[in-house]
């Protein structure tokens, strides 16, 4: 999942917005800022500014984010606001949407209504739609390739993706929907063939594909050549078809985002760090595919973090999945385990490993053992009379 995008304020660039005489050498910055803002304001479309004020929009935010929209001759402030209100947005929500996505006011109402109908194909009702727009206004107001978007939505529905997943993809990976639908179909065929070629079954392939697309839709932006090169490289490294299938099942489409060079670098680093044979390394990778996925700098940082905590290479090799944890998470968990008297460097890393939920469950068991009484309080005592 995955798969959440923001714009940076560029207010300081206002001073260079248009050519003007240079201010005095020691002129205060604030004076320069005010001067250029006034100059920009004189070129703004006053009708646009007035209509935005009526919608309770903070014009200063728009000037900082995308002041160019205020210079446009043709804008549709009232029309866009009306469409949002028809969907159920109140005045505060409308103002927030326009402040965060100012380019909405230069979208034609006709195009926005078409976009509205398109998104309604995957939303249960208008209430759900307006919530999505409030959360991801930029994705909604990226008005282009609408016919492609519609065809791609229909294609994903035919594949079996649920509407709730498609709506999430529309907001998180809009570029996928701007792809020609034939390109997405080609990529899906390549993924299906790749799964079957390494021994996957037809029955499992559909489940795998749907999980892959819901967790990593950006795979569709890859090229078929890159996918084939990755699989061929793994085979050259001695991985059998069954082992590659295991990696595909665990890493989903993330495996296809790796290039042979990055895989080779990660393999070389792990082999050197663990001082192991090619066969042993393959077993480590199958236990922890992150050894392939993470870059060398990330693996090195995480391994050094574990070593600083007194954990040995032998312990890491026994439980390599611990490398999936960031150094910050490792430090927090070790401190928590130490507070219960559990010394991680003398024990097994399984208690350190796992998701947050799994760790808390293990920690609870350790605490329970610590406070457990040495005798059964309900058992009868053998007392001599």
Swiss-Prot record:
Location of the transit peptide in the chain: 1-35
Record note on quaternary structure: Monomer.
Tissue specificity statement from the Swiss-Prot or TrEMBL entry: Expressed in skeletal muscle, heart, liver and pancreas.
Protein name (record): Transcription termination factor 2, mitochondrial
Protein encoded by which gene: MTERF2
One GO CC term, this protein: mitochondrial nucleoid
Family the UniProt entry places it in: Belongs to the mTERF family.
Subcellular location, principal: mitochondrion
Classification lineage: Eukaryota, Metazoa, Chordata, Craniata, Vertebrata
GO biological process terms held by the UniProt record: regulation of DNA-templated transcription; termination of mitochondrial transcription
GO terms, molecular function: DNA binding; double-stranded DNA binding; nucleic acid binding
SMART domains, alphabetized: Mterf
Alphabetical UniProt keywords: Mitochondrion, Mitochondrion nucleoid, Transcription, Transcription regulation, Transit peptide
InterPro entries, alphabetized: MTERF (IPR003690), MTERF_sf (IPR038538)
Role: Binds mitochondrial DNA and plays a role in the regulation of transcription of mitochondrial mRNA and rRNA species.
Keyword Acyltransferase included in the entry's annotation: no
